[in-house]
Amino acid sequence: MDIKVPFGATEKQKAIYRRDANFIASLLLNKLKYPPNAVAGIMANIGVETGHTYDFKQKQSKGGPGRGLFQMEIGGMYDAYQGWMKANNKRDTALSQLEYMDAAVKGKDGSHPTDKGRAYLGTNIPRYLNKSLHDELNTVDKMTMDFRDKFEN
C-alpha cells in the first residue's frame, strides 16, 4: 500500500507515520476483516483526516473540535465514542477507534447520545455502508467516497 506522509516531515517522522499507517491497515484487514478495497478506502479517509500522520491522538488544527483517526467532533461523534468506550471498558487507542468505527458501520455501537441503545448513525446508513464496504466488487474510489459521505459526514 502506498502510504502518503506529510510534506516536509523528517525521515524519522516519515518512518513513524508509515509504521502507524501499516499497523492501522493491518488491524482493518486482519482483525476487523475488511476486504482490501475497503481498507484502502478507509485508509484514504484516515490519511486526509489526520494530515497523513495516522496518529490516533491527532487533534484538529487551530483548536478545532476534531479528534482521532476519524476527526470525531467534540459535541458529536467524539462524545458518543467516549460513551461507547466507557460502556465497553475500553481506553482510547487506535484499535478502540477502529472498533468503534466498525461497530458504528454495523449499527451495533449503541452510542446515540440522546436515544440510548440506538446506533449513532441510525439504521439506514449502517445497513448501506456495511454492505458497500464488504462488497469486494466495489472499487477503492467508491468505498472511499461511501465511507467519507456516510461515516465522516
Question: Predicted segments — roles?
Answer:
Residues 131-153:
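Active-site or metal-binding loop neighborhoods of secreted/extracellular toxin and effector enzymes
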Residues 2-26, 30-31, 47-139:
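Peptidoglycan-targeting cell-wall enzymes and recognition modules
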Residues 22-25, 39-46, 141-148:
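Short, well-structured alpha-helical segments
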Residues 28, 36-37:
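GGW-centered surface loops in extracellular recognition modules
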